[in-house]
Regions:
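Alpha-helical support elements that line or immediately flank enzyme active sites
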Residues: 7-21
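Non-catalytic C-terminal accessory modules of carbohydrate-active enzymes
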Residues: 19, 24-114
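Solvent-exposed loop and edge beta-strand segments that line ligand/cofactor-binding
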Residues: 1-10, 52-59
Length: 114
């Protein structure tokens, strides 16, 4: 696989991997790449993989919406104007997941174990 050039591009690649049934590979990349931020002393996500640019950059937050949509599995039903949601998580290598997603109707709490 071609190395991920930046955290920005990683969002597209991670989504594609998960949609192709390769969630464990996507989770491994998340643990390796985003874990490196904290191993290098970071307290936020950086614009690039090293500390040469902005040390707090929104485009580097790719794992956050991925976690809500794929790993928690919270999906809004397209036909219901956001009032109804369904839960269909993709576990990959995860064994326990707990979290919540905020909606205009309140929080959707999810917890599951394999």
């Amino acid at each position: 696989m071609v190395p991920v050039g930046s955290p920005y591009f990683a969002d597209y690649m991670l989504r594609l991997l998960i949609e192709m049934g390769r969630a464990e590979e996507a989770q491994s990349i998340i643990q390796e790449r985003w874990g490196e931020f904290s191993r290098q002393g970071g307290t936020s996500v950086w614009e690039v993989w090293d500390m040469e640019q902005s040390l707090s950059h929104a485009w580097s937050c790719a794992p956050v919406p991925l976690a809500a949509h794929y790993f928690l599995g919270v999906h809004q039903r397209d036909s219901d104007l956001g009032e109804n949601y369904w839960i269909l998580p993709i576990a990959g290598s995860l064994r326990t997941v707990r979290g919540r997603v905020m909606t205009k109707y309140g929080a959707v709490h999810v917890e599951w174990k394999t």
